[in-house]
Each structure stands twice: as C-alpha cells, then as structure tokens.
Swiss-Prot record:
Subcellular location: Plastid, Chloroplast
Name this protein carries in UniProt: Small ribosomal subunit protein uS11c
GO molecular function: rRNA binding; structural constituent of ribosome
GO cellular component, one term: ribonucleoprotein complex
Domain of life: Eukaryota
Gene it is expressed from: rps11
GO biological process, one term: translation
Subunit structure: Part of the 30S ribosomal subunit.
Biased composition (Basic residues): 9-22
Keyword rRNA-binding: yes
Swiss-Prot/TrEMBL keywords: Chloroplast, Plastid, Ribonucleoprotein, Ribosomal protein, RNA-binding, rRNA-binding
Segments for region (Disordered): 1-22
Family designation: Belongs to the universal ribosomal protein uS11 family.
Length: 138
C-alpha cells in the first residue's frame, strides 16, 4: 500500500495579507485595457512588476454591466487606492482597446490625485495583417 502524500496548503488558504512588504513606489505605470465586455486596470512600477490590479468583474459587476463606464471608474478606484497608500505620486498611463471604459477610466485616474506624466494609446492596430472574422448576420 502506498504512503499517503501530505497535503500542501492551497494558495487560497496559505496567504492572509500581502506577500511582500509595502514598498515605496513614487512613480509607476497604469495600464488600462478597455474591451467591450470588461475593463482591466493594472498598476506596475517602472520596471514592469505588478503592484496592484483590478477589473470591473472583481469590483462586483457581472454580465453586460462590466463593460459600462461606471464599472471602469470603479475598477480604477479600486486599483489606485492601494498604490496611493504606497506613496505613488506620478504615473504614466497606457490605454488599450476600444471599450466604453476608456474615457471614464482616464477621468477617474485624473481625479485620484496622481500626477500624470503622459497618456499613451497603445491599442494594437494591424498593418493589414490577418484577415478579420466575417461579419455577424443576426
């Protein structure tokens, strides 16, 4: 009969607080990915390491409400709340995607009190690359 393998605690149960100590981050990059279905906000330091993130889905919105401007605004507020506590004062903003949450997310970032060094649209545009999918007939 084989020996029973001791169960290693799962990731969900193993961590109560933050893994790393709260480090001071004076400058960072805020990435906003706004699709038609959801808005994802990721805050990184200048080297690209993720400090905080949030999305409309994790902010409590479900279904089609995740794509709304108000959901994007709430997601930005949740993501930025933690980095302001860590001392972030200046940030660059990278906005990607065609969604409704683009402008609302940018407005929420401006209202948060973080000084924006620049705002860049990094939406991927094909230079006539792959053939797009056929149009829907509803």
């Amino acid at each position: 009969m084989a020996k029973a393998i001791p169960k290693i605690s799962s990731r969900r149960n193993g961590r109560i607080g933050s893994r790393k100590g709260a480090r001071r981050i004076p400058k960072g990059v805020i990435h906003v990915q706004a699709s038609f279905n959801n808005t994802i906000v990721t805050v990184t330091d200048v080297r690209g390491r993720v400090v905080s993130w949030s999305s409309a889905g994790t902010s409590g919105f479900k279904g089609t409400r995740r794509g709304t401007p108000f959901a994007a605004q709430t997601a930005v507020a949740n993501a930025i709340r933690t980095v302001v506590d860590q001392g972030m004062q200046r940030a660059e903003v990278m906005i990607k995607g065609p969604g409704l949450g683009r402008d609302a997310a940018l407005r929420a970032i401006r209202r948060s009190g973080i000084l924006l060094t620049f705002v860049r649209d990094v939406t991927p545009m094909p230079h006539n690359g792959c053939r797009p999918p056929k149009k829907r007939r509803v």
